[in-house]
């Protein structure tokens, strides 16, 4: 069974399907689970909780999806959570520069590389727009954070790109109120949001998606004392 067969079966049986599909302006990268899909997702989460969270006596939280600007300034997301993009001067189509280069020249450039490196390869390999063959502009960085405005004062905030942020900022309170001691594991299941340049392959690269995440806090000077640490 290939990818197209899986997609056809999923849509026919209502496992999952595009969000807002009855309207012509629906955006890519947003999918919804039907009844069967929800059942499968819930079974996975129950297994995850049973085999990891409850077995190792971890704490589970449910943090906010919208968080303050300060959180992401401290984490570095506002400055570094970005992908290299390049736009066609003719048809204005936008592409991920690293993927376009890999698809057309089979040259792999890490997305963290300097922008000048992308521009150089595009010029040397005479890479053009894959849609209209037009000339490409200079490569730029595109931040994938979803910005939102809070209240009538329009205070700047962001949808979280990962579930770990709540775990980190809530750790001091959790450690105190739960009378924790190191090592301690904190888990969270919830939605994250990334303004992907080119969401694709249905559930594999989304702009809104679920994450099940665990962070383990420990004393770095006592790693050898941790049970099963050598198995990680």
Model-derived regions: residue spans:
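TRNA-recognition modules of translation machinery and tRNA-sensing kinases, especially anticodon-binding
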Residues: 2-232
């Amino acid at each position: 069974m290939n990818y197209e067969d899986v997609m056809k079966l999923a849509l026919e049986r209502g496992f999952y399907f595009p969000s807002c599909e009855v309207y012509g302006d629906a955006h890519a990268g947003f999918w919804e689970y039907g009844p069967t899909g929800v059942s499968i997702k819930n079974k996975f989460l129950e297994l995850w909780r049973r085999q990891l969270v409850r077995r190792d006596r971890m704490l589970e939280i449910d943090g906010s999806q919208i968080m303050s600007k300060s959180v992401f300034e401290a984490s570095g997301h506002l400055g570094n959570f970005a992908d290299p993009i390049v736009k066609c001067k003719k048809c204005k189509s936008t592409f991920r520069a690293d993927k376009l280069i890999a698809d057309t020249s089979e040259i792999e450039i890490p997305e963290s590389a300097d922008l000048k490196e992308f521009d150089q390869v595009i010029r040397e390999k005479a890479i053009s727009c894959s849609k209209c063959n037009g000339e490409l502009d200079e490569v730029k960085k595109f931040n994938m954070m979803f910005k939102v405005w809070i209240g009538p004062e329009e205070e700047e905030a962001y949808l979280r790109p990962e579930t770990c942020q709540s775990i980190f900022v809530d750790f001091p309170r959790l450690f105190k109120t739960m009378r924790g001691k190191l090592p301690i594991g904190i888990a969270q299941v919830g939605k994250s949001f990334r303004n992907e340049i080119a969401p694709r392959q249905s559930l594999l690269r989304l702009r809104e998606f679920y994450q099940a995440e665990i962070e383990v806090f420990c004393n770095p000077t006592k790693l050898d004392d941790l049970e099963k640490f050598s198995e990680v």
